[in-house]
Amino acid sequence: VKPIARSYLDKLNDKLIAANFSGNPYVMQSNGGIDTFESTKAIPLTMIESGPTSGVLGAAELGKLIKENNLITLDVGGTTAKCSLIENGNVKIITNYWIEKNRKSAGYPVMLPVVDIVEIGNGGGSIAWVDNYDKLHVGPQSAGADPGPVSYGKGGTSITTTDANLITNRINQNYFCGGEIKADMDAVSKTIAPLSKKLKFTNEETARGIIRIANNNMINALKLVSVNKGYDPRDFSLVAFGGGGGMHATSLAKELNIPKVIIPVNSSVFSAWGLSLIHISEPTRPLYISYAVFCLK
């Protein structure tokens, strides 16, 4: 990780200098603070989950402004959905975070302070597929941003959650991506047809099934940060952000009896807003002293 992170930050710094940037650049940290390029290059693991952390910190700040201290956050992007819990305005920090931990992998431990976030492989680009037993699944594979969902018209060949939302008109087909992209609905219909035929559904029924499965996966993630840790979701409000957060939030809140859903202005870039509010922070680092040297002194 270190060589890649060092190279990336060095190139970024060179570009900032070339652009006549006169400020002091900092890097978001997974513990909820920011640190210098040099410190981050020394321990790049402190950047893990730093992007989603910005969103959680932003939700906590938003909660203070609107007097909502108990929040569950839902950040739905293109590949993943991430959840966290804020109690009495406090963001939870843990030191036993595991990367890539799931039912098939033990994951990798990160023994550093990290905002407590649960992540699953379900987002707007998550691919719908049918297994050999004719069972419909959504994710964890993703179409990414390029080629992206079939509806992008960029050569995508797999139906995604975004395509399903377009078929069911949960996304306005005539104002897709703010009107910047014309949704290729002909390609969407042709691509979902084999799935529908295998399932013996209409295209719209298949699309509704994709959305229900995606929602169910997200509900499980929300339960991991709440019910599984002894919290009652009914005592919290749900803050939804990211490109797809608002698309699924009300259905999830209804399922978990969460009384209020909050969708911030410019929710698709809400994590960037949260990042702008972060303070400089550096985790305490242990000092190792040789016992023999210590005795000699």
Locations of regions flagged by a protein language model:
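Nucleotide/phosphate-binding catalytic cleft detector across ATP-hydrolyzing
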Residues: 1-71, 186-235, 246
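Short glycine-aspartate micro-motif
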Residues: 47, 69-75, 117-119, 262
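Mobile "lid/hinge" segments at catalytic clefts and subdomain interfaces of large enzymes
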Residues: 81, 87, 116, 123-188
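Phosphate/diphosphate-binding loops
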Residues: 83, 87, 95-136, 251-262
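Conserved phosphate-binding/catalytic loops in two-lobed NTP-binding clefts
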Residues: 258-273
